[in-house]
UniProtKB/Swiss-Prot annotation:
Belongs to the UPF0102 family. This is UPF0102 protein RHECIAT_CH0000358. PANTHER family: UPF0102 PROTEIN YRAN. Disulfide bonds: none annotated. It comes from the Bacteria. Gene3D superfamilies: 3.40.1350.10. GO terms for molecular function: nucleic acid binding.
């Protein structure tokens, strides 16, 4: 496999990830969440979606897989640790941090189905 093939595969995966994150964000908005950030990057890691519902800050990992179980299983302990660290930085910058509770969710995006939201997944 040449460099061009690998680059094309990476580009396709990135595009699929971006589309999946957008689909997940729209899905969460329809459920009453306010989207505050997409692909929020910090020096400690990235959060796919930062959302809020009232005084609840929700940090969402989006996984596109062929099955829901595979999507949930794809969020490793290391990824969870990075997301938690990044969320701590995000929370520290919020003026109303003291009154916010937090939750870590997963949204599984699978072909030909509605996304599935797993609240409090980790």
């Amino acid at each position: 496999m040449g460099d061009n093939d690998r680059t094309a595969i990476r580009r396709k995966a990135l595009r699929r990830g971006l589309v999946s994150e957008y689909v997940a964000a729209v899905f969460l908005m329809l459920k009453g969440y306010r989207i505050l950030a997409l692909r929020h990057r910090t020096r400690l890691g990235e959060i796919d979606i930062v959302a809020r519902k009232g005084d609840l800050a929700v940090f969402v990992e989006v996984k596109a897989r062929h099955g829901e179980a595979a999507a949930v299983d794809a969020v490793s302990a290391a990824a969870q640790k990075r997301i938690r660290a990044a969320s701590d930085l995000w929370l520290a910058r919020q003026a109303d941090q003291a009154r916010l509770s937090q939750r870590y969710d997963i949204v599984a995006v699978t072909p030909s189905r509605l996304p599935r939201h797993f609240p409090d997944a980790f």
